[in-house]
Structure formats: structure tokens, C-alpha cells
Amino acid sequence: MNRLKQLRIEKGYTQVKMQMLTGIDQSDYSKLENGKRYYTFEQCRKLAIALDTSMDYLVNLTDEKRPYPRSHQKK
């Protein structure tokens, strides 16, 4: 199971709920989740926010699920 699907299930969200949270069409979201389509930077950002994780976690650059603390983000 990929990280996107794993996080969605952990949160108890449906694909329709993800559409509502991100604005990504449900059919496109399904393709992202099943690896049939790559997400754009903007889609990755929206997904990370909706799932309360970091973009790095979604793209397998880290194993840390939690998003970076706000104090380390640029303003």
C-alpha cells in the first residue's frame, strides 16, 4: 500500500472526502493513489496539508510522517 492511501485510511477519509479537502477530482485522486498518475507540486502540497504530513513523506524522502514544525518553515 502506498503512503498516500495508507495515510488516507489512517485518517478515516474516503476518496470523496479527499476531493473535498484538496480540490483534486476523485477519479484523478484514485489514479494518484494507485500509481497510475504522478502528482504535481501543487497537488502534493494540498495532499500533505489535508493529511497533516510533509511533502517529503509523501514522496518517500523521509520516514517521518509529521509535518515540519512551523518555526522551521519560511514565512
What positions do the PLM features span?
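Helix-turn-helix DNA-binding elements, focusing on the entry/boundary residues of the two helices
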Residues: 4, 15, 26, 41-44
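DNA major-groove recognition helix of helix-turn-helix
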Residues: 33, 43, 59-62
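DNA major-groove recognition helix of helix-turn-helix/homeodomain DNA-binding modules
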Residues: 23, 42-57
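A short, Lys/Arg-rich alpha-helix, primarily the initiator
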Residues: 1-10
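Short alpha-helical DNA-recognition segment
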Residues: 12-34
